[in-house]
Amino acid sequence: MSQQMPTYTYPRPSVATDVVTLRVHEGRIEVLLIERAETPKGWALPGGFLRVGGPRIELAAAKGATHPKVDASLEACARRELKEEAGVDPRKLHQFGAYGNADRDPRGRYVSVAYWTFVHNERCRPKAGSDARSFEWRSIDKAKGLAFDHDDIVKDAHRHIRRRRYEIDLFLDLMPAVFTYPMFKDAYALFWEGERKVDRSNLHRKVASEWAAAETDTPLASPGPKAAGAPAKRYDLEQVRRLMGAKP
């Protein structure tokens, strides 16, 4: 007897993913937005619909088979859409919420699963593609008036990250391949805004010994203005990740 995927008669909302892509630039947190080419137009987060196949394809996918036109998971959908619409291929995505209010999309009932990710300019060269007319980086406090409920998604992502601010290894994705402690400290401190200030002396004590084995003589790609005093120690990002046990 052949196996078949079960079918049901109740209505099914479409499933989508949206990605909050963040960087630190010139002392502020910025979010990547795309200008939608399709209706409803406006600025929005990169994202799109989960691609599914027919019963046979989905049955095979449930058994581990892959198909070029089917998303094997929600994360696969988020990665594909971010790549197609903005040309960004993040190292890691973090799922933080789902959105399905009846009034969130004028086209119908859609459920979106939201992710956030950190990037650095060195590893991120956005370009508009597929459904996007253009893209821009916008300060997170000015990411307002976006399409759908994306204002709320951006705010929720920011809150979620701030709740995880003690997981120091998460913030390494904001750094270039070679970085200094002051570069990391300044980026990390931005996510403490509105809370008590980060204890910089404790932070330095925590990472100084842990990162010692990752010191490098490789020059910074963008040195910036020369600071007074001894040059800051430089660290190799991948070595720091390994020392801190950051997940790949």
Each PLM stretch: what is its role?
Residues 196-219:
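Charge-enriched amphipathic alpha-helical scaffolds
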Residues 10, 99-111:
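Acidic pyrophosphate-coordinating catalytic loop
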Residues 6-31:
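Conserved N-terminal beta-strand and adjoining loop/helix that marks the start
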Residues 31, 35-43, 47, 54-55, ...:
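Short, His- and charge-rich active-site/binding loops that engage polyanionic ligands
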Residues 89-97, 197-201:
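A short coil-to-beta-strand element that immediately follows conserved catalytic motifs
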Residues 215-248:
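Long, intrinsically disordered, low-complexity Ser/Thr/Pro-rich regulatory/activation regions
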Residues 114-117, 125-165, 174-187, 202-210, ...:
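NUDIX/MutT-family hydrolases
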Residues 28-88, 167-180, 185-189:
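Conserved Nudix-box catalytic region and its N-terminal flanking loop in Nudix hydrolases
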